[in-house]
Amino acid sequence: MTTVHGISDPNYVSRQYRDASNLNVRLRLHQEFSTNPQGWHRWLFEQIQLPRPCRLLELGCGTGSLWAENQDRLPQGAEITLSDLSAGMVTQAQENLRSVRAEFRFAGLDAQSIPFQQGTFDVVIASHMLYHVPDREKALGEIARVLKPDGVFYASTVGLDHLKELKELAARFDEDLLFWGQMPADSFHLGSGVQLSRFFAQASVQRYPDSLVVTDAALLTAYMLSGRIDLSAERQEALAAFVAREMQAHGGQIVITKDSGVFAARGSLHA
């Protein structure tokens, strides 16, 4: 039996991110096989302008990788609140950042109902998470509300062609996986600037140039199994064998498109 879960299904999101295990599998693939020598989190941090002093909120902080990988760049005196809907993720972020010299605060919260007063933050970050939010308009309204009038919202996401070769690989293995990895057109992707225009006066986007050249069939299979699909043990074994054959047929590697970037939205219309 093959099951494909919706990317914003609350039950799926809750199970998927109850701890860091699935996320770590996906991060490892990108860390080992990305062609851009500047890692994603180092690049992303360069796109974020942090005023001094700064009050910052990150929604969906995951394991805290953005801050762990940029600890040498953190501005002094910044008040950084890291939050996630998953208590397991918050705990992992706390552990990962225990030795980092910065003023971190941690919170479990829902982006659709942010428990801070209007105009609290200079910067709000939502990295690769808005497509998981069931009521995105409500979340964007909340983000615009808690930003200061001159504050900036940074929202990273992927484009519709992100990992397109991997999606095609999955569909060749099983036509029931045709929609594995596909992002609905009304989700939040790099073509979704119009969604931000309802809440912010300006929004610009920067893309991160990168691709994957994967030479480890087992890790690629683990990546595919780490999110949105449920396969029986027998079908998992069949997928692993299929990926290995495909990689061998392509000279021992599979080249995969990456399309990621970040919006910077300014001028909250709810300030």
Set out the residue ranges of the language-model regions.
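Conserved class I S-adenosyl-L-methionine
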Residues: 2-52, 65-69
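Conserved Class I S-adenosyl-L-methionine
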Residues: 6, 30, 37, 63-65, ...
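Class I SAM-dependent methyltransferase SAM/SAH-binding core
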Residues: 55-113
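A short acidic, Gly/Pro-enriched loop at the edge of an enzyme's catalytic core
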Residues: 112-123
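Conserved catalytic/acceptor-binding region of the Class I
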Residues: 138, 144, 148-212, 231-236
